[in-house]
Structure formats: C-alpha cells, structure tokens
Amino acid sequence: MKNLIWTDNLNTGIDVIDKQHKRIVEYINNLYGALSNKADKTAVRDVIDELVDYTMTHFAFEEGMLDEYDYAQLDAHKALHEQFAAQVRELRDRFDSSEDASVELNNLMVTWLFNHILHEDAKYVPFIPKSRH
C-alpha cells in the first residue's frame, strides 16, 4: 500500500464532484497513514468512520444531482453505491469484531473509487449541464 496521488484522468470536469472525490482520496490516505503508523484500533476506527461517513455523504449528493437532471441510469448508479456500502459495512463490522479487515477496506476503497470514477461516473458527465462544470 502507498499514498494515492490524484491524477488529471480522474477529473470528471464537474468541479464539486472532483473536489469530493479528491477529499475521499485524502481520507483513504489518512487510513493508509494510520495503518502504516500502526495506530491503535480506536484511532483506525475513527479514520474508517470519517472515510465511510464522507463517502456516504458524497453518494447522497451525487445521487441528488443526478436526480435533479433526470439521469436515466440513476437507479443503476444508486444500486452500485448500495452494493459498495454493503461491502464497506461488512468490512467495518469485521474490523469491530477483532478481525483486522482495515487493509482489505483500504484496498476496496482504492480499487472501487478509481474504477467507479473512470467507468461509472464518466457515464453521467455528458448529461450534466456545462453550467455545473
């Protein structure tokens, strides 16, 4: 594992979404830092909570924006968010029950975020008015 670096190919061109995605990357890097520094379980859990809470807030914002512009694939996009949220909850529960799932959670966040931005979020960009970019 290593710190993530934001690259321009991850930009959607929608400023508010890009800022939120960059913030999620910061939270992922915070988790990596906590794990690398062998922070205690409470500190790691706090970082996990911040990461998960912010990601869920981002999902709600993104879904609201897509609804506002009548994005035809909103239900499918929401379903992807819900599947991911279920995976994250499972890993957080495993972490809470003394199974060290923090590295697995970090890896899931990295893989899912970049794939989601490049393959799923990119699909809705043409449907959002340029005034929102």
Predicted ranges, named:
Residues 1-133:
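Small-residue-biased structural context
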